[in-house]
Amino acid sequence: MEEHFIDLSKFMMANCPYEEAEGVIFSIPYDETTSFKPGAREGGNAIRTASWGLETYSPILDRDLAELKYCDLKDLDLYGSQEEIFGTIHSVSREILKENKKIIVFGGEHSITYPIIKAVKDIYDDFIVIQFDAHCDLRDEYLGNKLSHACVMRRVYELTKNIFQFGIRSGDKEEWDLARKNNLYLKMDLMNKDDLEYIKSLDKPIYVTIDIDVLDPAYAPGTGTPEPCGFSTRELFNSLYLLEEVKDKIIGFDIVEVSPIYDIANITAITAAKIARELMLMIL
């Protein structure tokens, strides 16, 4: 009887038991530090729903989701203070990584990346974080909160100096001064072949974090902090496809700041779902 029913509350084709899964999806419905328009807490389920409108096969990568072993644990159960919530994210992420499974996370706002990276730090002595984003996210604090989504890469920088920031076109003077003073690898353009070759030469584990607002609002209106003069969907995908050369080094990724209440015809959620599909086909 069960074969006649479908569970649309999970990412498409996420039918593998956790014990057998090589990749683990979960979402973090958290947006308490959003600095402009809240709503990213609903992003994970919007991405899941949108995934069912896509094909399982990628003609670019010549792979099909049906070939992969991954599960979807749905929403992480969150309660308590921000510190307690981040502690939960950290411990869950660490347990998944300890089992040599790839981690696939849907936000939620961008602050949730920090406790995930703390878990990465627990497992790997040295690693790389690649960020696609419109914003530096390098503030030391925002409205008195050092764990704000505006501070996430500043906190990550305290864990690893190997951060690569692409698509950045917004931030306050303090952030840009910090980047220049410390010679951070921060570019307004998307990652190109030369960038990838340098990353490849470092030969370290890689975690990828994608803030959907790296795209121009015309392509991704469903986000809480839209930033004009961004990139097209095709430009972003062409950059992401370069990661295939380091796919064996990628230990996980997140897609954050999808806020469906501001979306138009679900184009932001659909784009996020396709990003997830392509990266999963690449790394699993």
Swiss-Prot record:
Binds 2 Fe(2+) ions per subunit. Can also use Mn(2+), with lower efficiency. Keywords: Hydrolase, Iron, Metal-binding, Putrescine biosynthesis. Fe cation 2 binds at residues 133, 135, 151, 211, 213. InterPro entries: Agmatinase-rel, Ureohydrolase, Ureohydrolase_dom_sf, Ureohydrolase_Mn_BS. Its EC number is 3.5.3.11. The keyword 4Fe-4S does not apply. Pfam families: Arginase. Changing residue 136 to A: 89% of wild-type activity in the presence of DTT. NCBIfam families: agmatinase. Belongs to the arginase family. Agmatinase subfamily. Catalyzes the formation of putrescine from agmatine. Forms multimers. This is Agmatinase. It comes from Methanocaldococcus jannaschii (strain ATCC 43067 / DSM 2661 / JAL-1 / JCM 10045 / NBRC 100440). The lineage of its organism: Archaea, Methanobacteriati, Methanobacteriota, Methanomada group, Methanococci.
